């Protein structure tokens, strides 16, 4: 099993579309100004936006792993994207920067290296 796609709400479709293009995602599907699907630059995963009247706050966080959090954040800031936090080193051994899309969906740019899947506190192979 693989995670292929995540869909998040967009309260202003055109604004959200422009935002994710600025972030660097590639538009692969767009339908009736209410649904769009993007392909990430690396890997096979996709992210979709779907027009909604409201988007619940405190929902899932979208994590994009990048090679260099600081340079990626600087590049996005130069395009007018504001960050709410970071880049900062976290106690769980990741470097992170956080931002929100126009609908308020939280996004975390991070670099974790081996600690993403194999942190020092990872459970053994028999854990369920």
Regions found by a protein language model. Name each.
Residues 1, 33, 92-94:
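Loop/turn position at the start of each blade in beta-propeller repeats
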Residues 1-17, 60-62, 112-128:
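N-terminal beta-strand motif that seeds the catalytic metal site of vicinal oxygen chelate
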Residues 2-11, 38-39, 52-128:
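Vicinal oxygen chelate
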Residues 7-46:
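Core segments of cupin and vicinal oxygen chelate
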Residues 43-48, 104-107:
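Short, charged/polar, Gly/Pro-enriched secondary-structure boundary elements
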